[in-house]
Design a protein with these regions (language model features):
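Exposed, low-structure sequence patches enriched in small/polar residues
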Residues: 1-176
């Protein structure tokens, strides 16, 4: 558990991890990591086309919710051969509260008239980013200090503006 507070910006996170030795050869590690940031400041990247445009460098005050679900499986064939399988889903949702322009002095000036909405009234900045990755490792120690690793990786990335969708809906949309 970690908690940080600065001015009106606060964040905290927690991590749950279970380590299960199923047999002498099989080891299973599921984990869940959750991070919450409220009123954080950061560079605002539009993912849509905002109706109002600005020539200024835009920073945003935003809330960010990040979840990571991981499943790991280690299988030891012999003391020199092993397989490792890792499955991971990373989800980060960013909702903007208001926007600022970066001044030449390095300070931020609040833009009350800038909403960041597109022509349909939807935020051009809110973002729901997902990464689903699968990793498979084969390790062979053929001499002391010498090993061969074969690695296979695959990934799916999605991005949309549905920041209010529940986690399991977001995961389902990523896999479809």
């Amino acid at each position: 558990y970690v908690a940080v507070q600065r001015d009106n910006w606060w964040e905290w996170n927690y991590n749950l991890e279970l380590r299960l030795r199923i047999s002498n050869q099989l080891f299973f590690t599921p984990s869940w990591d959750q991070r919450f940031q409220n009123n954080s400041e950061g560079y605002a990247v539009p993912f849509g086309e905002p109706a109002d445009t600005s020539n200024a460098i835009i920073f945003g005050n935003r809330d960010r919710n990040t979840s990571t679900l991981s499943l790991g499986l280690d299988y030891t064939i012999t003391n020199r051969l092993g397989l490792t399988f890792k499955l991971r889903h990373y989800n980060s949702k960013i909702s903007y509260n208001y926007f600022n322009e970066l001044l030449s002095s390095g300070r931020l000036n609040r833009l009350d008239e800038y909403s960041g909405l597109d022509d349909t009234g939807v935020s051009a900045y809110d973002n729901n980013y997902n990464a689903f990755t699968i990793d498979l490792f084969f390790r062979w120690v053929f001499l002391p200090g010498s090993e061969l690793n074969l690695v296979w990786k695959n990934s799916i990335f999605t991005e949309d503006s549905f920041v209010n969708d529940p986690y399991w809906n977001t995961l389902g949309n990523t896999l479809n």
